[in-house]
Amino acid sequence: MKGRSWNGIIKWMMVVALGLVMAAPMSGWAKEKTVLSPSAKAGQKLFEENCTMCHYADQTKTKIGPGLKGVLKNKELPYSHRPATVANVQEQIEKGNAQGKPMPMPPFGGKLSAKDMSNLIDYLKTL
């Protein structure tokens, strides 16, 4: 090939590469990892120990219970359709949900201390 053809190919490849680099932040390639506060980190550990059997943290898809990604960022809670507030989430965790499908959600009120509940809520806010 002549030098002129190679120059054209190289320029074209550079334009494509530059376009990919510029599009990366918009496409999710360059997503930054969320840095959790100490309380949210403690809540994440509690979530992994108590909740992951039934709930996903990274998606909204149902496992046994609803996926909880964005649970406190949405307008309403999954299944109950109550407003997505800290108070409603805390009540759901404490009292459980006997009408949960396909299985009822057990109450965790007697299992989690006030500090544990606060840490868990702090973690759920990051989802």
Give a label for each model feature.
Residues 58, 66-67:
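Short, solvent-exposed linear motifs at loop/edge-of-secondary-structure regions
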Residues 1-9:
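N-terminal secretory signal peptides that target proteins for export/translocation
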Residues 26-46:
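Electrostatic cytochrome c docking/interface patches
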Residues 13-24:
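Bacterial N-terminal signal peptides
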Residues 32, 43, 57, 78, ...:
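Generic anion/oxyanion-binding catalytic loop in active/binding sites
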Residues 43, 47-57, 120:
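The canonical Cys-X-X-Cys-His
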Residues 62-63, 70-127:
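Extracytoplasmic electron-transfer domains, predominantly the class I c-type cytochrome c fold
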